[in-house]
Every structure is written in C-alpha cells, then in structure tokens.
UniProtKB/Swiss-Prot annotation:
It comes from Salmonella typhimurium (strain LT2 / SGSC1412 / ATCC 700720). One of its GO terms (molecular function) is transcription cis-regulatory region binding. It is found in: Cytoplasm. InterPro entries: LysR_subst-bd, MetR_PBP2, Tscrpt_reg_HTH_LysR, WH-like_DNA-bd_sf, WH_DNA-bd_sf. Keywords: Activator, Amino-acid biosynthesis, Cytoplasm, DNA-binding, Methionine biosynthesis, Repressor, Transcription, Transcription regulation. Belongs to the LysR transcriptional regulatory family. GO terms for biological process: methionine biosynthetic process; regulation of DNA-templated transcription. It comes from the Bacteria. Control of the last step in methionine biosynthesis; MetR is a positive activator of the metA, metE and metH genes. It is also a negative regulator of its own expression. One of its GO terms (cellular component) is cytoplasm. Residues 19-38 bind DNA. Residues 1-59 form the HTH lysR-type domain. This is HTH-type transcriptional regulator MetR.
Amino acid sequence: MIEIKHLKTLQALRNSGSLAAAAAVLHQTQSALSHQFSDLEQRLGFRLFVRKSQPLRFTPQGEVLLQLANQVLPQISRALQACNEPQQTRLRIAIECHSCIQWLTPALENFRASWPQVEMDFTSGVTFDPQPALQQGELDLVMTSDILPRSGLHYSPMFDFEVRLVLAPDHPLASKTQITPEDLASETLLIYPVQRSRLDVWRHFLQPAGISPLLKSVDNTLLLIQMVAARMGIAALPHWVVESVERQGLVVTKTLGDGLWSRLYAAVRDGDQRQAVTEAFIRSTRDHACDHLPFVRSAERPIFDAPTAKPGSQPRL
C-alpha cells in the first residue's frame, strides 16, 4: 500500500533531481532514503526510477505515481488548510442585559481587528429573552447571567460583578452604612423592562425577605441614572456601569446586604464552544472586559476577593 509520505518522497526526488539532494530536502541520510525506496519497490513489485541515471529518469510506473502525487498532495494541502480555517464566517450575537452594550461594542471592534473575515451580526436593541433563539439556531452567542438547566447550551464564564444600590446623593438611604431589604420596601425601584424574576436584586435580595417595592421600567441606562439622580427612584446596577457618574458626585452607590455579586456568561450551543471563531471571541471579549471595566474580576478569582477600580478605567454610558 502506498502512503502519502511515499508520494511526498517521489515528488521531492523529481524536484531535486537526485537521491542525495532529495535526502537533504527531506532531512534524511541518502542511505536511509535509498533503503526506503528499495522497501517500497519490493512491496509494489516494480522499480520507480533508474538508479544512477543522469539526469534522473523515472520508470513508467514511477511516472504514474508522480502524476498521482501531483493530483493528491495539493488536494490534501487544501483540505488541511480548510480544516484550520474558521468554519464560522458569521457570528450572530445578542445580550440579555442593557448595561452590557456599553463594553461589548468596543470589545466587538477589538475582536474584528484580529478576525476581519468574520461577519459580526449584533442584534439591534436589547433582547431580553434570546436563549430560545440560540437553542433554535437563530443566534450563535448570547451574553447572559441566567443559566437554563438541561437546555443543551454551554455557558462560558466571562467575569463577576457586584450589583450595587444606586441613589441620589441626598437620598435618606445614602447615609446608611448597610442596606437591608426592608430599607427598600417603600421605595420605587427603577428596572429594565424585564420580568422581576430575572433580576438579581429581586431573586437574591428582596424576594427571600418577602419585600416587594414598587417597580418602574426604564429602557435606557442613561435615562435611568438621570432619574435616580433626580430622586425619581432608586436602582440596582452593576458597579462598573455607574462608576464614572459616581465619581462626578451625581449618584452614590451602596452595598446590598453583605454584597450582591453576579456572573456574566457567554452562552452557545453545546459543542460550539470549540469552534475556532467562538472560542476566540469569548477569550477576546473576556480579556477586554477584565482589562478595561472597573470593579469586575475574572470569574476564576475567589468570590470574596473584592476587586478595585482600575486607574483610568471608565465605563461608557
């Protein structure tokens, strides 16, 4: 049986013109290459080339195998190249959180610089329930804090962030050292237009204590923060979202209870996380977020190891 390495050896012999030159190209000794040809000819039952011919002359059988090498080897090379190239040339992305768009846009630009051949399709507006579309193949990746059990989806951790209470500087709660669920009972909580069961502040802070404040939906982050500053309500937002306006003194933030932390994931269909494009995108966006967002930490760090703001880091609002 003839193998690919035999075809490559024949081609090297034709291109170099002598056994000694072919051995040098193939990084073998001349005697080893000669022995390899002798073994192959014995197995095939015919000679491949005329020894000591000047110039080197192939037998008719050798010419047939050379033609085979010229046909097969380029096909193998192209097939291997295709295997190493990204199978995905389009990445359809959606997010489940309003505030993610502030850092995801520059992260997309950063990824595109390294993968210009990949078409990025970012769902316009903010989709709050895109995981069913991901399951059905209508999307390729969803940024989410919610894990659906037995969904056939794979969730890659991106980073951890603290959800903090956002208040006007002159709000009565701004002077409290610790915020309890009961402190929010009579407040108006400004939220994004999403079911309250999807909110971390509801699931992990208010609901366990049986507290149900008045909820008011606002679909724009900047407007929501302005309403908080105007004493039209309070909010619970990722710390990095409000870091710059807090430094300006427009709002203050307080820790909820002992600290309310959440984790962002990149969700894909199980198996797709091994696609070259998907893997590179997740790694690129995770690194970008951890390098540029204040008050976030790698999902690999312990939950009790609180991060600090990175000098000069400012979220886009």
